């Protein structure tokens, strides 16, 4: 059975996911067969495994850092918020039910056996499993029924590293406060602290670290610097507030609409590696005059279309599109580009039909069954945003409940393969000029040749030189992350904790 180590945090967005990614890569570099695990994840960023199951995007990234194929066992329970108090519950990769927060509070303990069974399957196949917690283990209002922090640590006998974010301030208070709110038997599982996102001279922290260690009898095992320009997907939407927009010199300006229920926003990270500045905007005044407007995926298409209307963003997008600004919609954003959206089963809300932006001659109807599959195929259309790309290979994954019908709009992609075998269907749509494009393919910009051709089509339209981008190697990014974190933490002590386990 695999040995275990767990990363918990004092709150959300302290960097648990990226630290787990780093540890996964470090253990892989050291020759171990390693896998990530998070029993329960609440996220709108999702990934589809080869089996067609949904998991959190963070666990897919962590699996990539491990050099293994993502599986539903890495995230057996995924919660996808649909409204402020309701979530769609994904269990072992498949939709289980949609329930309120209060209902889930009662339901969650029933899923503990499912979560532990997934962890045990991972332990049977690997040398090490790195477990990620959620939020904080000191959320005392949730403690009795949580199945993602101390409950998992205790059930699995997993030693815990507690991470805190020093960049936001108050890290020592948050670490000590977390320990104080844990029960005595829970504190026993905390074997070390990781102070994350530090800027400056680490030696200046020594007096505070001495107090922390004296008061809690738990050692600080690392001070990790604030990571900049890392082309690795981030899980928390707080990342959008911190997003700097590019990784080097840029010649294209891309504005991504920050929908209230935005999902899979990391679809566009790769664009920033090829000379584009990627900005997330939520107000009409922030749009400016971009070369491309992107309407991203959303868990709730109809409510987010209503938001676009109420905020004035819809009018602005339509006006700019009519003046020639390129517009791309992905998944829910693709549905929004059409003329009508129908929801006869009230899948998303009580609204059964709503007008879209009308930039594509399409209509979307929501069905009861969700499509979740990896795909591969090629570009079919050859104009505008897809100019010169006909026949270019693409791959990615689909997660949607809508079925989109094309009228005068032109199909954009031909899907030829899924994990089940050969396929033959069309995806996406473009207007005749190719200036407005929609697709259901998540991860499409991970395809380097397509990404480069897509951006160069915009450059040609803009009248600026095309770029022959450098080959982007995400594997090197994982190594870069691992090297920085390895140099910042006491791996000798972490290996000792891993080997000793909980006794």
From Swiss-Prot:
- Which residues does the Swiss-Prot or TrEMBL record annotate as the active site? 331, 442
Supply the InterPro entries for this chain.
Answer: Class_I_gatase-like, CobQ/CobB/MinD/ParA_Nub-bd_dom, CobQ_GATase1, CobQ_N, CobQ_synth, GATase_3, P-loop_NTPase
Q: Which UniProt keywords apply?
A: Cobalamin biosynthesis, Glutamine amidotransferase
Q: Name one GO biological process term.
A: cobalamin biosynthetic process
Instruction: Name residues in a coiled coil.
Output: none
SS bond list: none
Molecular-function GO terms, alphabetical: ABC-type vitamin B12 transporter activity; catalytic activity
> What Pfam families does the database record attribute to this sequence?
CbiA, GATase_3
The pathway this protein participates in, as annotated, is: Cofactor biosynthesis; adenosylcobalamin biosynthesis
The UniProt record lists the GATase cobBQ-type domain at 251-450
Q: Tell me which domain of life the UniProt entry assigns to the organism this sequence originates from.
A: Bacteria
Q: What does it do?
A: Catalyzes amidations at positions B, D, E, and G on adenosylcobyrinic A,C-diamide. NH(2) groups are provided by glutamine, and one molecule of ATP is hydrogenolyzed for each amidation.
Q: Which family does it belong to?
A: Belongs to the CobB/CobQ family. CobQ subfamily.
> Which HAMAP family does the record match to this protein?
CobQ
NCBIfam families named in the record: cobQ, PRK00784.1
This chain's protein is named Cobyric acid synthase
Q: From which organism does this entry originate?
A: Dehalococcoides mccartyi (strain ATCC BAA-2100 / JCM 16839 / KCTC 5957 / BAV1)
